[in-house]
Structures are given as C-alpha cells and as structure tokens.
Regions:
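PRPP-associated nucleotide enzymes
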Residues: 1-326
Length: 326
C-alpha cells in the first residue's frame, strides 16, 4: 500500500507588522495562524502556537522593526521564539520570512574590535531551528552567505519600477553614493534611463551625519530619482537631493525598499527638495511617519509568490528573471 501525504502550509506572524502578514495570507488564500504572543510581568516574551503544525511547512513572518511596545530586538526575539516553538512542535520545515532583516548594516568589521552582528542574527535563526531564510533587498549581498542554509533574496525592484515609470520620460536614476551604483544601474537599465552618482563624504566620528559633495552625470534640467535600499535618518538622501538641485535638476524624487525613517527623517524630507518618496511596506508606517510626500506600494504580492514557490519547491529566482542574486 502506497502512503500519500498531503503537504501542509502554515503561516504565522509576529506583532511587528501584522497587516503585511494578513495581506500575504489573503493573497495565498490561507488563514494566518495564532502565535499567541504575550509578555510576562518582567518583559519576557512567550508564545503558544494555536494549532497543530506537525509535519507542516511553517512560514514565520516578521519585519525587524520598532513599533509601539516593541523594539527591533523584541521583534527579532519574537521570531526566534516562534521558530523554536514550531521546531519543538515537530514542523517539517521552518522558513523565517524577514521582509526587513535587522542589523543588516553591521555586515563587516569597519574598525577593530567591532562585531559582525548581521552574521550573529543569521546564526541565531539557524540555532533556533530555521531551515530557510527569505528576505527583501538585503543591505549587502554577502548576508546571503551568513545563514547556514538556503536564502531567497527577493527584490522590490518590480514594484518600485512600476511606480517610477509615472515620473516621466526624461528620467535620470541617481545613486546617492558609490556603494549603490550597481543597484541604481539595474533600475536605470530597466527604465531605459540615464545614470548619475552623488559622491558623499561622511563626517568623521559622527554617526548618521553625511555631507554630499559632487555629482557625476548629466542632471541639468532633468527629473532625477534617488534610489537606495533603505532610508533611515534621511541625511544621505536629503543632502544628495540638494546637490542635484544645485546642479540644475528640474525635480528630485527618492525611492527605497525599506522606509526606516528614524528620528529627524520625516521632517528632513518634508523640508527638502524631494518631491515624492516612493517606498514599499516592508516596514510598518505609523501615523507619525505618514506625510504627503510619501507613496507606499505593497510588497505582499512578491512575498506571497515567493512563499508559494518555496512551498511548491519551484524556482524563486524565475520570479525575477534570475536577477535577484545581487
């Protein structure tokens, strides 16, 4: 007698960005499982999965972000605890879905006696029991090698490019620094647009403080769009935008995958030459981070397709024409 087992897909989410997880579940036609997350009186996080996951493929969705009542460290810890709970409940395969991967900028030792925290986070996920990692637009490609297992590196480029097409014909895609030139070039090629680069000089010993310096490329009288993986305090983007205006750009917009928007970011963008900020919803955007210039596009369809491909054991890279390995 041949025994045929049916594959089971289960979706779970932490509390950092529940609306995104609910949108993904809706697109997949699946019900979002209950993780029953709570804190003890001393702040320790506890989870009890609400249904049987034995033998199932469990996808645990959590953006590593700060929201009311949760720090970025809490959001990572929630995901680790849910992974451990699923492993101990005999899940067949556990996939950590991290639309925004925390500590990604700490991907190397910039100076002596510094940690490589992006690698530490990857090790924690593996130790907790994750078999696979899914993320979007990692800050650097080498993070894919930090996790001891398959990593599906998705890109928000299809979503952002669709939005950027509405900016006009004579478009210049601009990299805000030399490190993002390769990404900006990919956008420029798909948009059939020209490419420009803004050189920047960081102020020594001042974290999150930058000074834009010069522009390479023809921007005079043209519409420019700055592209980066994330905008944190917006110092880089605003300084680059002012530099482009000084070099004759007719208008300047910005686009990013991850709108971190920490501290002074919102006020800086509001009071800058940036006309529109095009971004995705990899991170939650509470009321205090919403403003007229902000234009948010959902990343849920890309995540849903990737989750379906992983579950069905089909190609994820084909979703991006094989161009998601950078």
């Amino acid at each position: 007698m041949e025994l045929v087992t049916k594959k089971k897909l289960h979706l779970l989410s932490g509390r950092a960005h529940l609306p995104l997880a609910e949108e993904i579940a809706d697109l997949l036609g699946e019900e979002l499982g209950e993780a029953n997350l709570a804190e003890f009186a001393n702040g320790e996080i506890h989870s009890k999965l609400g249904r049987n996951v034995r033998g199932a493929d469990v996808f645990i969705i959590q953006s590593h972000s700060s929201v009311e009542g949760l720090s970025i460290n809490d959001s990572i810890m929630e995901q680790l605890i849910m992974i451990d709970a699923a492993r101990r409940a005999s899940a067949k395969r556990i996939v950590a879905v991290c639309p925004f991967y925390g500590y990604a900028r700490q991907d190397r030792k910039a100076e002596g006696r510094e940690p490589i925290t992006a690698k530490l986070v990857a090790d924690l996920f593996k130790s907790a029991g994750a078999d696979r990692l899914v993320s979007i637009d990692l800050h650097s490609g080498q993070i894919q090698g930090f996790f001891d297992g398959p990593v599906d590196h998705l890109q928000a480029r299809p979503v952002l490019i669709d939005a950027m097409r509405g900016l006009g014909q004579d478009l210049v895609v601009v990299s805000p620094d030399a490190g993002r030139v390769k990404v900006a070039e990919q956008y420029a090629n798909e948009l059939h647009a020209d490419l420009a680069i803004v050189h920047k000089r960081r102020v020594k010993d001042a974290k999150n403080a930058v000074e834009a310096r010069d522009v390479v490329g023809e921007v005079d009288g043209r519409c420019c769009v700055l592209i980066d993986d994330m905008i944190d305090t917006a110092g880089t983007m605003v300084a680059a935008a002012e530099q482009l205006i000084a070099h004759g750009a007719s208008e300047v917009h910005a686009a990013c995958t991850h709108p971190v928007l920490s501290g002074p970011a919102v006020d800086r963008i509001k009071n800058s030459s940036i006309g529109r900020l095009i971004c995705t919803n990899t991170l939650p955007l509470p009321a205090e981070k919403q403003f007229d210039k902000l234009e948010v596009h959902s990343i849920a369809p890309i995540l849903a397709k990737a989750i379906d491909a992983v579950f069905e054991d089909t190609s994820v890279s084909e979703l991006f024409g094989g161009k998601n390995q950078t």
